[in-house]
């Protein structure tokens, strides 16, 4: 019988966190120390009798994804008080949680998966849980409300296929914050081992294509920045801020943005997360 257990499971067993998802988020946030040493990989096997400490502020949201939307709100000046929103690619519900904590009155939590949304959110009357729903085919029959805001955090599918659907359910002048993930936007031949895209030139190409996809889908791109939290396996990701309506030409220093993101994240200033 093994005398070691995954760190995320141990956190739950010892009552240091309520769910495995939250335990994983806490670990990847760098808040967990085992025998005095920081461990930031949730799957690390540690001795069953190890001393485990949680240091610093615990996570405000049900998953670390909420921190990504929090940064978008701060950077883009987003206000969600009284808004009807959608969380596209909700998963555990970090974005949904962030929306509710910032005043959203209703959130449609959309995900192609099943059984992932945190129970706290699943049982919240302000949340409409839309599991087993492919966001690519969203329409007004599924979301009858006119949405003020939508977030997009999807994997294994390009934003090129998601943005037109989001445009269909968003009101004119509504806003979108979306994660731009090079590993799912670049061609397969440009994705490295373990699904990581490291080449800055590929990142630049992805961002240029994103501007085109947004315009073709009926959006104006208001701003772009990089996410201070890397994706799984350490991928650098970007955040786009869009408005539904006629295209307004704006100029972005995409080359400078890519250089800034690599300078900030390639040197380990932020850990990988989900």
Placement of each model-derived feature along the sequence:
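S-adenosyl-L-methionine
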Residues: 105-161
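Short, glycine-/aromatic-enriched active-site segment of Class I SAM-dependent methyltransferases
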Residues: 182-199
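A short glycine-rich, Lys/Arg-flanked "PGG" loop and its adjoining helix->strand segment in the class I
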Residues: 160-177
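Conserved S-adenosyl-L-methionine
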Residues: 98-106
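Flexible, glycine-/basic-rich loop-and-beta segments that form/coincide
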Residues: 236, 241-274
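Conserved class I S-adenosyl-L-methionine
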Residues: 81-91
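A basic, amphipathic helix-loop patch mediating RNA/tRNA/ribosome contacts
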Residues: 1-50, 84-85
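Glycine-rich SAM-binding Motif I of class I
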Residues: 93-94, 115
């Amino acid at each position: 019988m093994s005398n070691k257990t995954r760190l995320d499971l141990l956190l739950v067993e010892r009552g240091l966190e309520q769910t495995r998802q939250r335990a994983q988020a806490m670990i990847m946030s760098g808040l967990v120390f085992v025998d005095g040493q920081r461990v930031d990989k949730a799957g690390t096997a540690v001795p069953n009798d190890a001393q485990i400490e949680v240091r610093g502020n615990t996570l405000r949201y049900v998953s670390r994804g909420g921190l990504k939307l929090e940064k978008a709100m701060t950077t883009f000046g987003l206000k969600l008080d009284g808004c009807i929103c959608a969380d596209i690619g909700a998963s555990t519900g970090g974005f949904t949680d962030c929306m509710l904590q910032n005043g959203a009155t209703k959130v449609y939590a959309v995900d192609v998966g099943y059984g992932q949304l945190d129970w706290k959110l699943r049982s919240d009357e302000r949340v409409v849980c839309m599991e087993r729903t492919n966001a690519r085919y969203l329409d007004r029959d599924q979301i009858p409300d006119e949405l003020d805001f939508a977030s997009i955090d999807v994997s294994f599918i390009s934003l090129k296929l998601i943005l037109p659907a989001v445009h269909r359910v968003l009101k004119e002048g509504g806003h979108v914050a979306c994660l731009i993930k090079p590993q799912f936007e670049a061609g397969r031949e440009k994705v490295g081992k373990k699904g990581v895209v490291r080449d800055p030139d590929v990142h630049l190409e992805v961002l240029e294509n994103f501007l085109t996809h947004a315009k073709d889908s009926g959006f104006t791109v208001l701003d772009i920045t990089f996410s201070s939290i890397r994706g799984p396996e350490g991928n650098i990701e970007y955040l786009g801020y869009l408005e539904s309506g006629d295209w307004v030409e704006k100029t972005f220093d995409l080359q400078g943005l890519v250089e800034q993101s690599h300078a900030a994240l390639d040197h380990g200033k932020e850990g990988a997360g989900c």
